[in-house]
Design a protein with these regions (language model features):
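Active-site/ligand-binding-proximal alpha/beta "capping" segment
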Residues: 88-123, 130, 181-189
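Glycine-rich phosphate/nucleotide-binding loop
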Residues: 103, 124-127, 135-140
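A cross-family phosphate/adenosyl-ligand binding-site feature
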Residues: 1-96, 134-174, 178-194
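Flexible, glycine/proline-enriched loop segments at strand-loop-helix junctions
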Residues: 103-104, 128-132, 159-162
Length: 194
C-alpha cells in the first residue's frame, strides 16, 4: 500500500512531533508499505522518510522546484519527483497514494488534509483518511467542524469520511482497512463542502 503522510516541516516544534513522525516511518516500513511524502529533509518530513528508509522501506518524495532550490529536497528518496508548484505536488501525492495519514502540522498540512477530506466527502475517492493526534492538536478542528454541522454547513457524515486516532497502532489499523464509501446524493452535494 502506498501511504501518503502529511506532516510538519517547521523547525520550531517540540521534539515529540518529530519522534512521532519517525515512529510512523519505521512502522510503515515494518508493515511493508511505501511512503509517499512531501520530499523534504526537514522536521517531521525528514524524520518520517529517514526512519522509513532505515527500516528498509521504499520512499517516494514529491517536492516543488522552489524547495529544491533552497536545498531541502530529500535526494536519498527511492524516487524523487520535482513539480512546478505546490498544486501539482498535491496532485501527484494524491495520484500516487492508496491511503492518507495526517500527523500534527501547520497550515500546509491543513490544506492537504482539507483537499483529501473534501474529495472523500464528495465521494470522489474512498481511500482511507486518518488523523493521528496523540496530543489533541486537532481537537479544536474537530470542534469547529462539529459547530459547522450544528449550523447546517456540513452533513453529519462529514466525520464518516475520516478516522481520528491517538496511537500509531490504531492509525495503521484504519489505514489498512477499506472504509465505507461516502456517497452523497445530488441534493446533498451542496452541503458537502459548504
Amino acid at each position: 500500500v502506498n501511504i501518503c503522510v502529511f506532516c510538519a516541516s517547521s523547525l520550531r516544534i517540540d521534539r515529540k512531533y518529530v519522534d512521532l513522525a519517525a515512529e510512523v516511518g519505521a512502522e510503515l516500513a515494518r508493515r511493508g508499505h511505501t511512503l509517499v511524502s512531501g520530499g523534504a529533509t526537514v522536521s517531521c518530513m525528514g524524520a518520517v522518510t529517514s526512519a522509513a528508509r532505515a527500516a528498509g522501506g521504499v520512499t517516494v518524495g514529491v517536492i516543488p522546484q522552489v524547495l529544491v532550490d533552497v536545498e531541502v529536497a530529500d535526494t536519498d528518496s527511492d524516487e524523487l519527483i520535482v513539480t512546478a508548484g505546490m498544486r501539482e505536488r498535491k496532485g501527484v501525492m494524491d495520484a500516487r497514494s492508496d491511503a492518507f495519514l495526517v500527523l500534527p502540522g501547520g497550515i500546509g498540512t491543513l490544506e492537504e488534509l482539507f483537499e483529501i477530506w473534501t474529495a472523500r466527502v464528495l465521494g470522489i475517492h474512498d481511500r482511507p483518511l486518518v488523523i493521528l493526534d496523540p496530543w489533541g492538536l486537532y481537537e479544536p478542528l474537530r470542534q469547529l467542524v462539529s459547530g459547522m454541522h450544528a449550523e447546517g454547513f456540513t452533513r453529519a457524515d462529514v466525520f464518516d469520511a475520516i478516522s481520528w486516532t491517538t496511537t500509531v497502532e490504531e492509525a495503521f489499523a484504519h489505514l489498512e482497512a477499506r472504509p465505507q464509501p461516502v456517497r452523497p446524493s445530488i441534493a446533498e452535494l451542496g452541503e458537502a463542502t459548504g
